[in-house]
């Protein structure tokens, strides 16, 4: 849970900050455990936002209700959410702003066009796919993602000799199902791309990407910029 890892994360953030990093130059997007209740979302999201993160990634999302719990937890109670007004923490320090300015900026984009918090919602199960249109329709999602790696396991079977066999057609169908929901409800769609597939994924309509580490990751970034004319 968040309690077990928060101290380690804060120590890492402090080291980054001591080296000159801020939310403007080095924004953090952190991964949440699966949301099981509104109460969990309110408590654990507030704890992470209070450290100065700029985004929260919600994994294994399977219903619109979970999304609403998650997004409400990213908004102050005074803005209609469930984030306690007291949960400012040390966020203003990492953002490099006053507490008053942090409170103004720390709202959820795109519900607040000037908000500087963003949510990532990941669909990576059959149940999530069955509900993906309802999920995508919830206002306030920053980026909706198919959990491509997890979905590979979902659409794989194990042969008699123990070899894992992927149903490529079903897996790709799941990826496209999430993309279609994004397009229908005008939500940015993300994908974990590499140099071999970023061009086709951009052509399909994916607009947000995560890449791997090292030279291969940087090569993918450069290729993506070139393809986008940047």
What is the predicted role of each segment?
Residues 26-33, 56-58, 119-123, 144-146, ...:
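Hydrophobic faces of well-ordered beta-strands that scaffold small-molecule active sites
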Residues 179, 183, 202:
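Anion (oxyanion) recognition and catalysis
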Residues 55, 196-216:
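Short, electropositive alpha-helical surface patch
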Residues 43, 51-139, 148-153:
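Conserved anion-binding
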Residues 1, 34-36, 60-62, 123-127, ...:
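Active-site-proximal loop/turn and secondary-structure-junction residues that shape catalytic pockets
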Residues 2-68, 73-76:
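Active-site beta->alpha loop and helix N-cap motifs at the rims of alpha/beta catalytic domains
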Residues 64-80, 160-161, 214-230:
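C-terminal helical cap(s) of enzyme catalytic domains, especially alpha/beta-barrels
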Residues 1-12, 146-169:
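Glycine-rich, proline-tolerant flexible connector loops at the mouths of alpha/beta enzymes
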């Amino acid at each position: 849970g968040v309690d077990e890892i928060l101290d380690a994360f804060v120590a890492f953030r402090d080291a980054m900050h001591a080296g000159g990093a801020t939310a403007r130059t080095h924004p953090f997007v952190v991964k949440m455990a699966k949301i099981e209740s509104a109460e969990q979302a309110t408590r654990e999201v507030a704890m992470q936002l209070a450290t100065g993160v700029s985004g929260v990634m919600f994994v294994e999302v399977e219903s619109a209700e979970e999304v609403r719990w998650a997004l409400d937890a990213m908004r102050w109670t005074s803005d209609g959410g469930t984030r306690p007004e007291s949960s400012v923490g040390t966020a203003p320090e990492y953002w490099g702003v006053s507490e008053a300015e942090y409170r103004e900026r720390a709202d959820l984009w795109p519900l607040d066009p000037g908000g500087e918090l963003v949510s990532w919602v990941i669909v990576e199960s059959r149940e999530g796919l069955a509900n993906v249109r309802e999920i995508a329709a919830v206002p306030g999602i920053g980026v909706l993602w198919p959990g491509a790696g997890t979905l590979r396991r979902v659409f794989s079977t194990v042969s008699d000799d123990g070899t894992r066999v992927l149903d490529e057609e079903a897996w790709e169908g799941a990826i496209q199902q999430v993309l279609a929901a994004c397009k229908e409800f005008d939500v940015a769609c993300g994908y974990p791309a590499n140099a071999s597939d970023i061009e086709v994924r951009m052509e399909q309509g994916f607009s947000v990407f995560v890449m791997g580490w090292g030279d291969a990751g940087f090569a993918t970034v450069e290729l993506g910029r070139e393809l986008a004319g940047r």
